[in-house]
Design a protein with these regions (language model features):
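Gram-negative outer-membrane beta-barrel transporters
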Residues: 78-85
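Long amphipathic alpha-helical scaffold regions
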Residues: 1-9, 15-17, 105, 109-132
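Secondary-structure boundary/capping residues
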Residues: 30-31, 84, 116, 173
Length: 209
């Protein structure tokens, strides 16, 4: 570590509570819901991250206490055409001033024997922590706190995804070499309000013994 961000030993302690319920609304409809509550005490910033403040480079400082709360709802609906639609929503709030909403959906569709396709969308938005700033005017920050963590800033993001699952043992049952193989292809397009975007491609090969 640099001389300006050396810190002594510290700790972090988290107390976690949650309650989750599942309800079958019909033979084709399932819902899941829950709440979570976390109390975090101790070191909650990075001792290796610095911030430009008041013309100087200083270590970031976060509050030592944080209370985090969230609630979620998930709904799954299955259809007779061998497809399913899933919806999820999560609300989050903490005493650092961050309030976030996350909503997403997934459509899964049977295409042909051994072939399944999925389409995904997720939207996320959050407010900034009360002590976050793009330009601190003094080394004291805001109420004594400073952050260089991008996760403390306001944000809105979108994610689109598409995936294919192929069971080659079903699709090419007459080819002995493929009977134990499966292939998965995932593509995601992500972009946010902080001028960051990414294209993510993942592939996987499954071999069944």
């Amino acid at each position: 570590a640099d001389d300006d961000n050396n810190t002594g030993a510290d700790h972090k302690r988290t107390l976690h509570w949650n309650a989750v319920g599942t309800e079958v609304l019909s033979p084709a409809t399932l819902t899941r819901f829950g709440v979570e509550y976390n109390i975090v005490d101790g070191l909650q910033h990075s001792p290796y991250r610095n911030v430009y403040a008041g013309g100087s480079i200083v270590p970031e400082r976060h509050p030592d206490h944080r209370e985090r709360r969230d609630a979620f709802l998930k709904l799954s609906q299955y259809f007779e055409n061998r497809s399913s639609l899933r919806f999820n929503y999560r609300l989050y709030q903490d005493d650092w001033g961050i309030l976030s909403h996350e909503a997403g959906t997934r459509l899964s569709q049977y295409v042909a024997p051994g072939l399944f396709a999925s389409y995904d969308y997720r939207y996320y938005t959050q407010t900034a922590a009360y002590f976050q700033s793009d330009a601190y005017t003094s080394v004291g920050g805001i109420d004594g706190y400073l952050t260089g963590d991008y996760r403390m800033a306001a944000l809105a993001s979108h994610l689109f995804g598409f995936s294919l699952d192929m069971d080659l043992g079903v699709m090419a049952a007459d080819v002995p070499a493929l009977r134990r193989l499966g292939v998965r292809i995932d593509f995601e397009r992500y972009f946010n309000s902080n001028n960051y975007s990414a294209n993510i491609l993942e592939t996987g090969l499954d071999f069944r013994f």
